[in-house]
Amino acid sequence: MSFDFIKDKNKHIHFIGIGGISMSGLAEILLYNNFSISGSDMNSSPITEKLKDKGAKIYIGHKKENIKDADLIVYTAAIASDNPEIIEAKEKNIKLMDRADFLGNLMKGYKYNIAISGTHGKTTTTSMLSHVALKANVDPTILVGGNLDIINGNVRVGESDFFITEACEYKSSFLKFFPYIGVILNIDADHLDYYKDLDDIKNAFSKFIKLIPKDGYLVAYGEDKNIQSIIKEANCNVITYGINSGDIQAHNIEYDEKACGNFDVVKDNQKLFSVKLNVPGKHNILNSLASICIGLASNMKDKDIIEGIESFFGTHRRFELKGCKNNITVIDDYAHHPTEISATLDAAKKYPHNKLFCVFQPHTYSRTLTLFDDFTKCFDNADEIILADIYAAREKDTGIISSDMLGDKLRDRGLKCTNFHKFDDIKNYLIENAKDGDLILTVGAGDIYKVGEMYINL
């Protein structure tokens, strides 16, 4: 690991938005290497408390006074230009670096950077691969967009040349990375507040492919038509995977009673080995194939790949079993794009249940608006839909779109759908209507998981 771009270990580095999952991971890597770290966030959280315990100075709220001792400031794409700490840094000529630039510079210190991109499945695949790499004893540094039990958080600092990270396409952040193995899980229309259209998104992924060196590897889902159209841009080794085609395929797929797949891994019509997943759905078969391809490209042993895949039981907020109450199961999932919701509901439909309640909180006004038609068609596997208000995240409500409008369209299609504006009202509705053997699935990237926790903790 090298921190040459920072120049001086005595420097004080300040993170604006330090409570974010990626920012906190970067801060933790630097704390491990004895840098002086501070950071600000709008709210205290278990993440900020953990960083404080590790030696970071944490400020709640954004104020210009927070950066008085900083030599370098790292900020996220979600931080507005009128943030008082950004303004103060510019006035004082303190160096500013966005999160993607910082992570990209950090990656320069590693030889085997594995960057996992795609519209869906990045966190799960990064986590699954992390299990494989740890079983193979390659001692990787890991930065993942969720909490992973095997590393007790979202970051692990290793001593080898292996660095495993997610590569997010939002605002073309992943184009600042240095992948030796670049992974594309899928390409779908998303982040249309930044990208003009799907072709614009595909163009960004095409540029990502060109970042991979000639002796490196592109691992890609070969049955995705959007990937097929850009894979020719690769000037490196290419490994494709899929169910019915690709260099590495899944054959003889069977699902257990909880929708977890087991299958044979096949190359050139020859069986390599079999694996049994402990995460549900077809989408996780594809995620596991990507992890298997990376393991094979990295010369990991079949035994370690199998054990790593089979030891993975998921990450927090990815089809996470929250608990059972009165024989009613509560599961939470981070799905916030129509494609993800369809995949999650498909897995839930295979899960043991009588009636399936889907409690959905749309994430951002821009996504709800630009993908509105797709949102009206992705809930068909739910027996009943409960909609919360849109989670704004980095956006402001312009009054153009609302959950009520989505609910109206779903009801027009003949689906049973109810809108609520308060979590307490959702909880009370579930208390009255969920019965023995039912399944409650909370879905969304905001704070809808709290509804499930409220229900479980009655």
Curated annotation (Swiss-Prot):
<comment type="function">
    <text>Cell wall formation.</text>
</comment>
<dbReference type="GO" id="GO:0009252">
    <property type="term" value="P:peptidoglycan biosynthetic process"/>
</dbReference>
<dbReference type="Pfam" id="PF01225">
    <property type="entry name" value="Mur_ligase"/>
</dbReference>
<dbReference type="InterPro" id="IPR036565">
    <property type="entry name" value="Mur-like_cat_sf"/>
</dbReference>
<dbReference type="GO" id="GO:0071555">
    <property type="term" value="P:cell wall organization"/>
</dbReference>
<comment type="pathway">
    <text>Cell wall biogenesis; peptidoglycan biosynthesis.</text>
</comment>
<keyword id="KW-0132">Cell division</keyword>
<keyword id="KW-0961">Cell wall biogenesis/degradation</keyword>
<keyword id="KW-0436">Ligase</keyword>
<dbReference type="Pfam" id="PF08245">
    <property type="entry name" value="Mur_ligase_M"/>
</dbReference>
<dbReference type="InterPro" id="IPR050061">
    <property type="entry name" value="MurCDEF_pg_biosynth"/>
</dbReference>
<keyword id="KW-0573">Peptidoglycan synthesis</keyword>
<keyword id="KW-0067">ATP-binding</keyword>
<dbReference type="InterPro" id="IPR005758">
    <property type="entry name" value="UDP-N-AcMur_Ala_ligase_MurC"/>
</dbReference>
<dbReference type="GO" id="GO:0008360">
    <property type="term" value="P:regulation of cell shape"/>
</dbReference>
<dbReference type="GO" id="GO:0005524">
    <property type="term" value="F:ATP binding"/>
</dbReference>
<comment type="similarity">
    <text>Belongs to the MurCDEF family.</text>
</comment>
<keyword id="KW-0133">Cell shape</keyword>
<dbReference type="Pfam" id="PF02875">
    <property type="entry name" value="Mur_ligase_C"/>
</dbReference>
<dbReference type="GO" id="GO:0005737">
    <property type="term" value="C:cytoplasm"/>
</dbReference>
<dbReference type="InterPro" id="IPR013221">
    <property type="entry name" value="Mur_ligase_cen"/>
</dbReference>
<keyword id="KW-0131">Cell cycle</keyword>
<feature type="binding site">
    <location>
        <begin position="118"/>
        <end position="124"/>
    </location>
    <ligand>
        <name>ATP</name>
    </ligand>
</feature>
<keyword id="KW-0963">Cytoplasm</keyword>
<dbReference type="GO" id="GO:0008763">
    <property type="term" value="F:UDP-N-acetylmuramate-L-alanine ligase activity"/>
</dbReference>
<dbReference type="GO" id="GO:0051301">
    <property type="term" value="P:cell division"/>
</dbReference>
<dbReference type="InterPro" id="IPR004101">
    <property type="entry name" value="Mur_ligase_C"/>
</dbReference>
<keyword id="KW-0547">Nucleotide-binding</keyword>
<dbReference type="InterPro" id="IPR036615">
    <property type="entry name" value="Mur_ligase_C_dom_sf"/>
</dbReference>
<dbReference type="InterPro" id="IPR000713">
    <property type="entry name" value="Mur_ligase_N"/>
</dbReference>
<protein>
    <recommendedName>
        <fullName>UDP-N-acetylmuramate--L-alanine ligase</fullName>
        <ecNumber>6.3.2.8</ecNumber>
    </recommendedName>
</protein>
